[in-house]
């Protein structure tokens, strides 16, 4: 998001932003931090994505320039077995709506690698629409997703997602230290010096770590398609 880029800009790391966006970070939450959970902002509501709202989800989940990539990802990971639609996706994909009913944020939990016999709970595609940030929507949505989830819960992100990493840390997520997860390198060691420069000191020193990524690693090895 724009704010993440501004943090890199303020740290004099503009030139690294695009490259760093290709680095992999993996996190685990064994149990959410209760003090981080928040109620919905007044008048807002949460509902599931309807089968006729895939285009709405794509617009919420990523910048419009990534629509084709998101369509491909949906078809490979969420639609499943060549089906056009998978009811499980629409049961798990949440929209946060303003009092007027407008969806402004989305996120979902998913049972990744279930088809290959190594099911793990993952969190993904959490995003608040630009212009709607800073109003507590992301924190409220993540609270609801965690209330509905099984654990441990894993996610994949990049060191350019500074604000999200801080949010995940508040909710009890720990950065995995395992050097490889499935077929992807874990770029934690390369990312930490950068994060130290772009995060507030208290937030950076509040990061926690875990070496409990073996189950996720084994699950991710079961398919060449990255399901989270």
Identify the role of each PLM range.
Residues 13-19, 146, 169-178:
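Conserved acetyl-CoA-binding loop of GNAT-fold acetyltransferases
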Residues 62-128:
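A conserved beta-strand-loop-helix scaffold within acyl/acetyltransferase catalytic domains
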């Amino acid at each position: 998001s724009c704010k993440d880029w501004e943090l890199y800009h303020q740290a004099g790391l503009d030139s690294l932003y695009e490259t760093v966006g290709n680095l992999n970070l993996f996190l685990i939450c064994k149990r959410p931090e209760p003090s981080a959970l928040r109620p919905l902002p007044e008048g807002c509501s949460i509902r599931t994505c309807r089968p006729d709202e895939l285009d709405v989800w794509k617009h919420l989940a990523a910048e419009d320039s990534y629509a084709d990539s998101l369509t491909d990802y949906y078809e490979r990971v969420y639609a499943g077995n060549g089906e056009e639609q998978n009811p499980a996706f629409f049961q798990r994909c949440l929209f946060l709506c303003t009092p007027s009913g407008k969806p402004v944020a989305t996120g979902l939990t998913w049972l990744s690698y279930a088809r290959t016999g190594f099911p793990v709970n993952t969190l993904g595609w959490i995003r608040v629409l630009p212009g709607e940030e800073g109003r507590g929507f992301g924190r409220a949505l993540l609270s609801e997703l965690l209330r509905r989830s099984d654990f441990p819960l894993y996610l994949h992100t990049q060191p350019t997602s500074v604000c999200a990493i801080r949010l995940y840390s508040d909710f009890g997520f720990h950065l995995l230290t395992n050097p490889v997860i499935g077929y992807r390198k874990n770029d934690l060691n390369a990312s930490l010096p950068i994060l130290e420069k772009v995060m507030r000191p208290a937030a950076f020193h509040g990061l926690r770590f875990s070496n409990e990524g073996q189950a996720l690693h084994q699950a991710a090895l079961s398919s060449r398609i990255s399901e989270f």
